[in-house]
Amino acid sequence: MSIRHNSRLVAIVDDDESVQSALQDLIESDGLSTLCLGSAEQFLDSEARHKAVCLIADIRMPGMSGLELQAKLKAEGCRIPIIFVTAHGDPEMRTLALGDGAVEFLTKPFNDAVLLEVVHAALERSGND
């Protein structure tokens, strides 16, 4: 769990290490820093909670789900842009996530170019691009 220092840190929260690795390679190839974490609880306990300018998270994970993480951050007044990348493309989950403020809800397998476009749009809207 190391951060390559850059003012634009993207936190990746997914319980699947292969997904973490794929997202990390993609995001870092675009010049952004990353921190990969295996659970929502790890994110909440990490320095990324306060330093990340964008959060990419899975919906279904052991322990706290991505939707529960989003609700907790929102309740605390955290305005980090959240992008959900999930294998579960349930329309109801998508509606819940986007209705609660998520930037985007992408299903796996995702298109690399689309994901990078969404990340940059989120950074631009939050003033971090």
Model-derived segments and spans:
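Short, conserved "switch-loop" micro-motifs in signal-transduction and mechanochemical regulators
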Residues: 76, 87-89
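Receiver (REC) domain active-site loop signature in two-component systems and cognate sites
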Residues: 61
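Active-site beta3 strand of CheY-like receiver
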Residues: 50-56
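Acidic catalytic/metal-coordinating carboxylates
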Residues: 38-39, 65-68
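Alpha4 helix (beta4-alpha4-beta5 surface) of REC/receiver domains from two-component response regulators
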Residues: 68, 89-104
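C-terminal output helix
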Residues: 92, 110-120
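Two-component/phosphorelay signaling modules centered on CheY-like receiver
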Residues: 17-35
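Active-site residues of response regulator receiver
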Residues: 58, 86
